[in-house]
Amino acid sequence: MANIVSNEKTYRHTQKVRKENHAKMSKLRTIVKKTRSSNEQAQLNEAYKVIDTTASKGVIHKNKANRLKSRTAKAFKANLQVVA
């Protein structure tokens, strides 16, 4: 651990941000998994919202967000065709 006060504060802040980012990523993964096996349009819209929010907060890159949305929509559409 750091011996300088400002470094200790930075360490505490970093740990706090790390926990927040981990929670956001966990929520993102959970909703994407649920959406891919779902057949409700509202679920897909919620996934888009979470993905965009996570990207805007800087947790994931915007290109990764777009890729996730595309792949989630593709899996969602395939699931709809199987159910129908």
From Swiss-Prot:
Q: Which NCBIfam families match?
A: S20
A Pfam family per the record: Ribosomal_S20p
Matching SUPFAM superfamilies, A to Z?
Ribosomal protein S20
The organism of origin for this protein: Ureaplasma urealyticum serovar 10 (strain ATCC 33699 / Western)
The UniProt entry's GO biological process terms, in alphabetical order, are:
translation
What GO cellular component term, any one, is given? small ribosomal subunit
Q: Which UniProt keywords apply?
A: Ribonucleoprotein, Ribosomal protein, RNA-binding, rRNA-binding
Recorded GO MF terms: small ribosomal subunit rRNA binding; structural constituent of ribosome
HAMAP family named in the record: Ribosomal_bS20 (MF_00500)
Signal sequence span is: none
Looking at the record, which segments are called Disordered? 1-25
Q: What does this protein do?
A: Binds directly to 16S ribosomal RNA.
Q: Which gene encodes it?
A: rpsT
Q: Which domain of life is it from?
A: Bacteria
- What family name appears in the similarity comment? Belongs to the bacterial ribosomal protein bS20 family.
Q: What is this protein called?
A: Small ribosomal subunit protein bS20
